[in-house]
Amino acid sequence: MTLNDIDLEKRIINIDHQLQRTSDMRYYVESTKTDAGKRKLPINEGVARCFAAIIEDREVPAVEKLIDGYGGFLFYDDKGMPLVAMHWEHRFNNMVDRYNTIYKIQMPNITPHVCRHTYCSNQAKSGMNPKTLQYLMGHSDIGVTMNVYTHLGLEDAADELKRIEALELARKEIEKKADTPPEQLLFRSV
C-alpha cells in the first residue's frame, strides 16, 4: 500500500494493485487477482486515525524505492525495501511464537489471511448486507464470501433466532396498538 492509495479526507482506500516479490528477491507490482478485487474501500474514523498515525510515524528510507512506477510505500524492512505479504506472515508468526512461549494456553496459528476471514465473519454476524460484504472483500462470487470466508456456528444461529423472535414480539405489540383507530393515535401524538 502506498500513500497515494489512502485518502484520509474522504476516508477511502484505493485497492487496484499488489506488491509481489519473486524468490530471487525481485519486486514487481501487478493488478489484483480479479476485477472485483479492484475497489475503493470506505474506512471508519478509527481506521482513518490508525492510518494517520502510521503515516505520521512512517520511517522513510534515505532513498525511497520506485517499483514499476509506485513509491511512497507505508512500510519498509530494515534494508529499505517495501514489505510484502511474506513479511507480514513472518511478523504474525513471531508474535504467536512469543505469546506461546510465555502463556500456558496456546494461541493457534494466525496469519493476515485469517484476519480477512475474521473480518468477514464479524461483518456477517453484525448483519451487514451480503452484497456489500462481497464488495468489501473483493470477491467476484458471493458464494466465496458467504461459504468460504464467513464462519458461523450454533451460537450465531441461536442469536439470530433470538433476534427474529424479538422482532416478531415487537410486531405483535404494534398490532395490538393498531386496534386503536388511527385518528385517535394521531390525536394522542399531537
Predicted regions and their residues:
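Catalytic-site neighborhood detector that most strongly recognizes the C-terminal catalytic loop/helix
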Residues: 6, 18-19, 137-163
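Generic beta-structure capping elements
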Residues: 16-18, 46, 78
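C-terminal secondary-structure termini that scaffold catalytic or DNA-interacting sites
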Residues: 10, 23-38, 45-47, 60, ...
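Short, basic (Lys/Arg/His-rich) helix/loop patches that form interaction surfaces
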Residues: 41, 57-66, 70-82, 86-135, ...
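Short, charged phosphate-coordinating catalytic segments
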Residues: 1-19, 131
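Ser/Thr-centric signal marking residues that sit
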Residues: 32-34, 111, 118, 132, ...
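Generic recognition of well-ordered alpha-helical segments
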Residues: 45, 49, 53-56, 90, ...
